[in-house]
UniProtKB/Swiss-Prot annotation:
Keyword Oxidoreductase included in the entry's annotation: yes
Active site: 151
Enzyme's top EC category: oxidoreductase
Pathway, per record: Amino-acid biosynthesis; L-arginine biosynthesis; N(2)-acetyl-L-ornithine from L-glutamate: step 3/4
Biological-process GO terms, alphabetical: L-arginine biosynthetic process
Protein name: N-acetyl-gamma-glutamyl-phosphate reductase
Family indicated by similarity: Belongs to the NAGSA dehydrogenase family. Type 1 subfamily.
Name of the gene this protein is made from: argC
Gene3D superfamilies with a match to the protein in the record: Dihydrodipicolinate Reductase, domain 2, NAD(P)-binding Rossmann-like Domain
GO molecular function: N-acetyl-gamma-glutamyl-phosphate reductase activity; NAD binding; NADP+ binding
Keywords: Amino-acid biosynthesis, Arginine biosynthesis, Cytoplasm, NADP, Oxidoreductase
Length: 347
């Protein structure tokens, strides 16, 4: 049986990264996976070669308009659409179609949080696409609807969830994530112009205003016996892609560096895409570039009485498209790691 895949929002950064990964997927090489409709609103009528010269295999494919009719007849549909648009399309697709949404529309469980941060009516919650979270891999196997996590919540959750679950820390965390400009998407923006970003760092959506704040709190709260307070600060850096996250929290009394390291090594021992670095090594965005990996380091600041966890991911791969393909693999029964690079690009 051949699985036919469509990508809505194919000309965006996330859509292009999904295409790159699918073209390297063993199921594509064997004919078990076929790439069908490629759609987008603003670039409909253009060829993929005009928009994405790094994907010559599909250069002649014409981008179609994003409609439910165009996406009909596919087994899997990836949605790389702006927040709010995904729900509109998803609700028109049949229950037998596997829909994997890279937007935020179905991530949050709390309707009030959705309405506060996104300003529209909450459309519900789908199985959440971080397989490394306790219980999530099982929920994703065979799932027909999947909410791909946000890029910042991915880095923050993988950094902190072992410590929260093991009760190493107080439920009050501070997260700072430095991100590349591709996280802002392809839409023209003065704030993302090279002349505005090169040689400069800038915090934005501070003091709890960023939309990913409730998502991080939701994830950590799943493994905590009480709500987790999250202070989240994103920082824009002059990088095309990558997220470096540093997370701190007060330690519970008596927790040692050895205990913390043992918790992380055990938690991620069987995880293909999370690597706990040796003592003294630090995560680097370059080391995970183009891969589906998350590199993690855990340390104890004894003077401050805090844990310090650092993580690095590629925001377009493990932070979006890689997670989407990982979830597709689980949903349709492929090997979970199929088509997903475990080695970064260096230098």
């Amino acid at each position: 049986m051949t699985i036919k895949v469509a990508i809505a929002g194919a000309s965006g950064y996330a859509g292009g990264e999904i295409l790159r990964l699918l073209l390297g997927h063993p199921a594509y090489a064997s004919g078990e996976l076929e790439i069908g409709a490629l759609t987008a609103a603003s670039t409909a009528g253009s060829t993929l070669g005009e928009l994405m010269p790094h994907i010559p295999q599909l250069a002649d494919r014409v981008i179609q308009d994003t409609t439910a009719e165009t996406l009909a007849g596919h087994d899997v549909v990836f949605l790389g659409l702006p927040h709010g648009f995904s729900a509109e399309i998803a609700l028109q697709l049949g229950p037998d179609v596997t829909v994997i949404d890279c937007a935020a529309d179905f991530r949050l469980q709390n309707a009030a949080d959705w309405e506060k941060f996104y300003g529209s009516e909450h459309q519900g919650t789908w199985p959440y696409g971080i397989p490394e979270m306790p219980g999530h891999r099982e929920a994703l196997r065979g799932a027909k609807r999947v909410a791909v996590p946000g890029c910042f919540p991915t880095g923050a959750t993988l950094a902190l969830i072992p410590a929260v679950q093991a009760g190493l820390i107080e439920p009050d965390v501070s997260v700072v994530s430095i991100t590349g400009v591709s996280g802002g998407g392809k839409k023209a923006s003065v704030a993302l112009l090279g002349s505005e970003t090169m040689g400069s760092l800038k915090a934005y959506n501070t003091s709890g205003k960023h939309r990913h704040t409730p998502e991080i709190a939701q994830n950590l709260g799943e493994v905590s016996d009480k709500p987790v307070k999250v202070s989240f600060t994103p920082v824009l850096a002059p990088l095309p892609r990558g997220i470096l996250t540093t997370a701190t929290a007060p330690l519970k009394e008596g927790v040692t560096a050895e205990q913390a390291r043992a918790v992380y090594e055990e938690f991620y021992a069987q995880e293909t895409f999370v690597h706990v670095l040796p003592e003294g090594a630090q995560p680097q965005t370059q080391a995970v570039l183009g891969s589906n990996m998350c590199h993690v380091q855990v340390e104890i600041d004894e003077e401050a009485g805090k844990v310090l966890v650092t993580s690095a991911i590629d925001n377009l791969t493990k932070g979006t498209a890689g997670a989407a393909v990982q979830c597709m693999n689980l949903s349709v029964g492929f090997d979970e790691a199929a088509g997903l690079p475990q080695v970064g690009v260096a230098p």
